[in-house]
C-alpha cells in the first residue's frame, strides 16, 4: 500500500485499523526509515508492519489490506522499546539472529490494537503483542500474494540520510578533475 504524501507535507487520509483484542496477525514488512527528527532530536528509526487479514474497498473499488505498524528507534539495547517489543512477542529467551529485523517477516503474532485520537486524526496503535498460540495457528492470515515490501517499490527513495552526511547537489557534481584522474 503506497504511502502518498500531500503537497502540504502530511500523509494522505487513511482508514485506521479497527480496534481489536487478540487479533491473529503476520509480520509483513520491516522498514528502515533512516534518520528522522523527533521530539528528542534526530534518531534512526525502523518499523514493523503487521497484517491481520482485514481488507477494505479503496477509492477505485480495489481491495486494500489494512495494516498496522509500530515505530521504534533502531536500538537493541536491553532497555529499548524495540528490544522489549520483540521479547514480548517472541519470548524472553529469543535472540534475533544478527539483530536482523527482516528475520521477523512471516512470523505470526496475537495483537491488541487500540485507537488514539488527536485533534487532526485517529491512529491505530499496537498496544500489546504475543506469540500466536499453537491452537490458533490456522487463524493466522497469510502474507497477501500481491503485497510488495516498501523497499522493493519503485517509488521509494530509500531511508532518509543523516542531514550532516548528505551533500548539496552542487557539491556532488564537480566539473574539476582530480590530479589522479
Language-model-derived ranges and their functions:
Residues 1-181:
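Short beta-rich binding modules
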Amino acid at each position: 500500500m503506497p504511502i502518498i504524501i500531500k503537497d502540504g507535507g502530511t500523509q494522505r487520509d487513511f482508514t485506521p485499523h479497527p480496534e481489536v483484542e487478540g487479533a491473529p496477525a503476520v509480520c509483513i514488512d520491516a522498514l528502515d526509515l533512516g534518520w528522522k527528527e523527533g521530539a528528542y532530536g534526530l534518531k534512526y528509526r525502523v518499523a514493523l508492519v503487521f497484517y491481520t487479514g482485514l481488507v477494505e474497498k479503496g477509492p477505485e473499488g480495489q481491495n486494500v489490506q489494512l495494516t498496522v505498524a509500530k515505530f521504534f528507534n533502531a536500538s537493541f539495547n536491553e532497555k529499548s522499546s524495540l528490544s522489549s517489543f520483540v521479547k514480548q512477542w517472541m519470548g524472553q529467551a529469543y535472540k534475533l539472529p544478527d539483530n536482523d529485523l527482516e528475520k521477523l517477516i512471516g512470523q505470526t503474532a496475537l495483537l491488541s490494537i487500540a485507537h488514539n485520537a488527536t485533534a487532526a486524526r485517529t491512529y491505530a496503535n499496537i498496544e500489546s503483542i504475543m506469540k500466536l498460540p499453537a491452537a490458533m495457528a490456522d487463524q493466522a492470515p497469510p502474507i497477501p500474494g500481491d503485497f510488495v515490501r516498501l523497499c522493493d517499490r519503485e517509488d521509494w527513495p530509500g531511508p532518509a540520510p543523516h542531514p550532516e552526511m548528505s551533500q548539496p547537489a552542487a557539491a556532488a557534481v564537480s566539473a574539476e578533475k582530480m590530479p589522479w584522474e
